[in-house]
């Protein structure tokens, strides 16, 4: 992993880019966690991110900033409660002040099965191989 990428990961934020039907690349800022080399984040199950991923799983994660290090990969929607709760707990470690405000809304969506996890498996060679951050 390059020093630039390592610094960017510690910001725990990314610009997630996925493709519209037209092929246009859409970037959206989201938080991130890294789990065994895969980039993960939470979103609502009816978000446009989810709809675009289901149509075309190819994605690019710009780590740390809109023009940060690009990590291309394949995204998938994960609905497993344990994985979602792991990322929820990681968010408390990385963004505690914001989570104090939005935690109830996220927890409610998890309880009502309206929250999903997006997992991006980076292309090989994986620059985040075997990395987990933050550890929960």
Regions found by a protein language model. Name each.
Residues 3, 16-23, 102-108:
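Short helix-to-loop capping/linker segments positioned immediately adjacent to catalytic or ligand/cofactor-binding
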């Amino acid at each position: 992993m390059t020093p630039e990428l390592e610094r960017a990961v510690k910001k725990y934020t990314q610009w997630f880019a996925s493709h519209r039907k037209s092929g246009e690349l859409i970037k959206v800022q989201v938080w991130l966690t890294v789990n065994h080399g895969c980039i993960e984040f939470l979103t609502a199950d009816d978000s446009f991110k989810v709809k675009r991923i289901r149509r075309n799983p190819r994605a690019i994660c710009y780590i740390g900033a809109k023009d940060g290090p690009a990590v291309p990969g394949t995204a998938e929607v994960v609905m497993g409660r344990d994985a979602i709760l792991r990322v929820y707990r990681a968010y408390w470690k990385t963004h505690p002040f914001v989570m104090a405000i939005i935690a109830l809304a996220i927890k409610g969506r998890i309880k009502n099965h309206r929250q999903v996890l997006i997992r991006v498996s980076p292309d090989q060679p994986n620059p985040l191989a075997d990395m987990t951050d933050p550890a929960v």
